[in-house]
A protein has these predicted regions:
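Short glycine/acidic-rich loop motifs that flank beta-strands on beta-rich extracellular proteins
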Residues: 27-31, 59, 80-86, 103-111, ...
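Feature marks extracellular polysaccharide-active and adherence modules
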Residues: 11, 19-21, 25, 64, ...
């Protein structure tokens, strides 16, 4: 699916890092407001689901087709769409990120971290406050996902905090390429709706194998 470029893009790279105590404010409220305005119009025509595709919003960061990438110790906030997406990549580390998409409005589909068709990923010491999945694992969607057939596997999530959101760790709904070997431990959930959320669709295909999250502390979560 064609989607707008992210604010920061790491494409076809190897052995690179972005680190430091700075803040990337993506000022995504303009996209949030556009979505809610379009949604009202689409709902009147019983086309609510289409607005998710027609209202293309900008991600905060994208790592794509890359290896040995590290993101460390900065704040990412007010992204127009997903916060940080790791796509078709291997051996990446996200350490000490603070993602806050609950500043100045209600951002739709503002996932914190999305790992998509990628392998050997470490997510640690991150804090995510958002309006959708806190940390989400995906592996391609429908026919295109089956065509690409790249799994998300060998994922470790540890020492992370999920605040507002729709799932500390969510698998899916993009599952076509399979999600395998996920380990989560020493995790804290304060306000997210679920600690582990599994979702897919009847015609999507794929599999979900060997997932083991172990939250240490939960509050107002299922």
């Amino acid at each position: 699916m064609v989607w707008p470029s992210a604010v920061i893009n790491i494409l076809d790279a190897e052995n690179a890092a972005i680190s430091g105590a700075g803040t990337l404010d993506c000022r995504g409220k303009i996209f949030w407001d556009k979505y809610w305005t379009m949604r009202k119009d689409y709902e009147k025509r019983k086309l609510r689901w289409i607005v998710d595709y027609d209202c293309k919003r900008v991600r905060g960061m994208l790592i794509s087709n890359s290896r040995h990438i590290t993101l460390k110790d900065f704040t990412l906030m007010r992204t127009g769409f997903w916060g940080c997406q790791v796509l078709y990549s291997d051996q990446c580390t996200l350490n000490g990120l603070k993602i806050n998409n609950n500043v100045g409005g209600h951002g739709p589909s503002t996932d914190g971290i999305d790992i998509d068709s990628s392998t050997n990923i470490l997510i640690e010491n991150c804090e995510v406050d958002c309006n959708d999945d806190n940390i989400c694992l995906k592996a391609g969607r429908d026919a295109d996902g089956l065509r690409v057939n790249r799994p998300t596997e060998n994922i470790i999530v540890r020492g992370c905090i999920a605040r507002k959101g729709a799932g500390l760790i969510t698998c899916g709904s993009e599952t076509s390429g399979c999600i395998r070997n996920v380990l989560g431990y020493n995790l804290q959930a304060y306000g997210t709706s679920s600690t582990l959320r599994l979702k897919s669709a009847m015609n999507r295909g794929g599999c979900l194998l060997y997932t083991s999250p172990s939250p240490r502390d939960t509050e107002r979560s299922r």
